[in-house]
Amino acid sequence: MLFRSKGVLPWSTLGVSETDGWGRRFTYRASQGVNSNFADGADGTGASCNIAAGVSFQLCSSANLNVLATSGGSNVATSVPAVVLSHGKNGLGAYPGGGGNAIGTASGDEGENGDDDNIFVSKDHSANFDDQVVWLSPNILFNRMVAAGKLP
């Protein structure tokens, strides 16, 4: 199975809607330490660190995504494993439903959400910012993996 650190949210695999309320696909980014540490089989092989037999996932390094209040501003959340984005009504940086190229390029705080780095901005809606950013905390990730029997 191939895991990518960013792209269009795999809606079918996750069992969620393909598009947001504006008909555009959600995008995501996963920390490199998270997406490269899945085992290929029950023997625990295939990850970038040693994983015990029978464990299909192990976080081998700290997550490296950060969510800020503004570009260059204060931290809202640090060391998060994954971020999911709706690029809002203006759709800048989003992909249209059904496929196709990204719609335009955002700037300012919205630009931070599509510039291929590990920094994202989440703040209240305004005339210049309509992105919706959701992140997965490490605690929630560990809780769900334990509940699913994927972590000891």
Question: What function would you assign to each model-found segment?
Answer:
Residues 7-10:
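Short loop/turn motifs at secondary-structure junctions and domain boundaries
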Residues 13-15:
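Short loop/turn microsegments at loop-to-beta-strand junctions
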Residues 24-25, 30-152:
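Short, surface-exposed interaction loops/tails
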